[in-house]
Design a protein with these regions (language model features):
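Second-shell loop/turn segments in exported
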Residues: 36, 74-81, 120-121, 146-153
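N-terminal targeting sequences that direct proteins away from the cytosol to non-cytosolic compartments
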Residues: 5-9, 15-60, 138, 147-173
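Short beta-strand element of the conserved SAM-dependent methyltransferase core
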Residues: 64, 72-74, 117-124, 134, ...
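Signature of long, low-cysteine stretches enriched in small and polar/charged residues
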Residues: 92-139
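N-terminal secretory signal peptides that target proteins for export/translocation
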Residues: 1-2
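Short acidic-hydrophobic surface loop/beta-edge motif
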Residues: 29-39, 64, 107-110, 121-122
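Secretory pathway targeting signatures of secreted, lumenal, and periplasmic proteins
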Residues: 39-88
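Glycine-rich phosphate/pyrophosphate-binding loop shared by adenosine-nucleotide-utilizing enzymes
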Residues: 142
């Protein structure tokens, strides 16, 4: 009986040492990020160490950059009169046409209650990995995405998902 207790104490000590050495970071978008209001009723957070990039004002894309990483936001007018599921398939088709591999689609639950789609994959030509959070309404498609090289993407994915999922759009205009 004493040997079992000693074994348990040793086991708890080893687990404690390993757990203390783990590096676990918690990200809070509203504490660690910057609020960006993209228009009437549309807002999201981006990391405070990313900088708003002055890109082409005519392409309608807002970019936030840090080294080899980019967060972007864009709104596209819906050209088709389809329901959300059909628009999701059309967006998936657009990504596939731009030669992406390992494309996965899922529907995460956002705290804001928005029904959106998450597209995750990589571009064949550039090797960049991406995750796009896409929200469809009757008139527009809203895309908030993260793209980076494989190393940075893998390292920062959990953190970036917190920011992507901070996207909110109110229906009150």
């Amino acid at each position: 009986m004493k040997s079992i207790i000693k074994l348990m104490v040793v086991f708890v000590c080893v687990v404690s040492l390993v757990a203390c050495g783990r590096k676990d970071t918690t990200v809070s978008a509203n504490k660690d990020g910057v609020l960006y209001e993209a228009g009437v009723g549309v807002s999201f957070y981006y990391p405070s160490d990313f900088k708003l990039s002055e890109g082409n004002p005519n392409d309608g894309v807002t970019r936030f950059t840090k080294e080899n990483q980019i967060l972007f936001y864009k709104v596209e007018e819906n050209e088709y009169d389809n329901d959300t599921d059909q628009l999701s398939e059309l967006y998936k088709g657009e990504l596939e046409a731009s030669e992406v591999s390992s494309l996965k689609v899922k529907m995460p639950a956002l705290e804001s209650g928005l029904k959106c789609y998450e597209y995750k994959g990589s571009y064949v030509k550039t090797g960049l990995k991406f995750i796009h959070l896409v929200y469809f309404d009757d008139k527009n498609t809203y895309v908030y995405g993260y793209e980076a090289n494989r190393k940075d993407f893998r390292k920062n994915l959990k953190k970036m998902i917190v920011y992507l999922e901070s996207f909110t759009k109110s229906s009150v205009l």
